[in-house]
Amino acid sequence: MAKSTSKTGRIAIIGASGYGGLQLVKLINEHPNFEISTLNGERSVGKNWNEINPFMKILQDKKITKSNIDEIALDSDYAILSLPNGLSSQLTPLLLKKGVKVLDLSADYRFKSLDKWKEVYTKEAAKYKRYDYELCEEAIYGFSEEFSSEISKSRLIACPGCYPTASLSLLIPFLKQGLIESEGIIVDAKSGTSGGGRNPNEQLLLSECSESISPYGVIGHRHTAEIERIASHFAGHEVNLQFTPHLVPMVRGILSTVYARLRDPGLTAEDCKIVIEAFYKDQPFIDILPVGIYPATKWVKNTNKVMISVEVDKRNGRIVLMSVIDNLLKGQAGQAVQNLNIMHGLESDIGLPKITFYP
């Protein structure tokens, strides 16, 4: 890793009023190498941040402003976009043209093919006209543990989704080394309600989701295509898998369980644990649990950690991989700051929490 850049990085947070934006404000405000230069948010334009968020006062109070590309370019080195899908693509080309590096938390640049994005995000494609084919090709997928070299040289990072982060952290080591069959992979994931965002949503009302668990997006969830794209990249051929998300009555956290068939049925759980440990050696945010101990979302809450466990079912030759993340940190804002650290020439873990408050 390169030495720390002496200059403090100036960060514009665009879309600061959502849950992802709130996490970003906290992380950047407390970061030793970055400062908040601009806070944009359509909900509270003209109001001071500390006035509308008394529970999260920042060191240097900022007024919420509308996005003005020229003003952002004057006082920002980086812009982190925490915006709805489609909207980021309307600002990103303008920011890049002004020399501002962009980290995008939406799905707008997660596909190398703009046509594929339009196929997956049909409603957004109808609403926002896009012709930025070259930027889709240029963008680096921000899975920090695997693409750090590319991230360090890039001006545009497509930060992964929360479900893909949890699921790909399990799949990549085994697909890249050809240790599992690429057919018949099942990804079963559970998420807390904050993954649905801060806007009103009947499904996320307390009386609707409390004391209940339910699947959604069973066939064709948008993250399926994202997981398959990156899985195919590491497998070296097309991967078609089954992904089913579930909503559980908690605020934050994701549990992802992956089922796949081992190419070598003689591999044990200990063997597979060694594979993961070797693959993620020296990665500060990946924790591998002993065989027989299974991860809980509470163990990573309010951290940027991924906690992984593995089992092998000898009866059918299947591997069972489990991971937990905090969907708002490692699954969103924390991973963005991890990528920002890499872009700025810092160690990837600076300014990011590693230990939960427990219980």
UniProtKB/Swiss-Prot annotation:
Molecular function per GO: N-acetyl-gamma-glutamyl-phosphate reductase activity; NAD binding; NADP+ binding
Domain of life: Bacteria
Compartments it resides in: Cytoplasm
Family: Belongs to the NAGSA dehydrogenase family. Type 1 subfamily.
CDD domains per record: AGPR_1_C (cd23934), AGPR_1_N (cd17895)
GO cellular component: cytoplasm
EC number: 1.2.1.38
Role this protein plays: Catalyzes the NADPH-dependent reduction of N-acetyl-5-glutamyl phosphate to yield N-acetyl-L-glutamate 5-semialdehyde.
Pathway the protein acts in: Amino-acid biosynthesis; L-arginine biosynthesis; N(2)-acetyl-L-ornithine from L-glutamate: step 3/4
Active site: 162
Cleavable signal peptide: none
GO biological process: L-arginine biosynthetic process
Catalytic activity: N-acetyl-L-glutamate 5-semialdehyde + phosphate + NADP(+) = N-acetyl-L-glutamyl 5-phosphate + NADPH + H(+)
Protein name according to UniProt: N-acetyl-gamma-glutamyl-phosphate reductase
Pfam families reported in the protein's UniProt record: Semialdhyde_dh, Semialdhyde_dhC_1
Lineage: Bacteria, Bacillati, Cyanobacteriota, Cyanophyceae, Synechococcales
Keywords assigned by UniProt, alphabetized: Amino-acid biosynthesis, Arginine biosynthesis, Cytoplasm, NADP, Oxidoreductase
